[in-house]
């Protein structure tokens, strides 16, 4: 178990999480957010 091998495996598992976060951020720009999570990245609905 070499340090380089561990780093490559850790990085491989990180990439799906990063992709999910990026997808969530993109979705928030076009969808309504829950009011407690409202910020500049999402279009908030106040109805």
Swiss-Prot record:
Where is this gene product found? Secreted
Q: What is its main location?
A: secreted
* Gene Ontology MF terms in the entry: toxin activity
| Species lineage | Eukaryota, Metazoa, Spiralia, Lophotrochozoa, Mollusca
Q: Which UniProt keywords apply?
A: Disulfide bond, Secreted, Toxin
Q: Which family does it belong to?
A: Belongs to the conotoxin M superfamily.
Gene Ontology cellular component list: extracellular region
Entry annotated with the keyword Iron: no
Tissue localization of expression is: Expressed by the venom duct.
Q: Tell me the disulfide pairings in this chain.
A: 32-44, 33-42, 38-45
Q: Do the record's keywords include Disulfide bond?
A: yes
The protein in question is named Conotoxin reg3.11
The domain-related comment in the record is: The cysteine framework is III (CC-C-C-CC).
Q: Which organism is it from?
A: Conus regius (Crown cone)
Q: Which residues are processed away as propeptide to yield the mature protein?
A: 1-31, 46-47
């Amino acid at each position: 178990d070499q340090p380089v091998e561990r780093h490559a495996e850790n990085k491989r598992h990180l990439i799906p999480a990063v992709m999910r976060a990026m997808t969530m951020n993109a979705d928030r720009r076009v969808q309504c957010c829950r009011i407690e999570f409202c910020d500049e990245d999402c279009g908030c609905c106040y109805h």
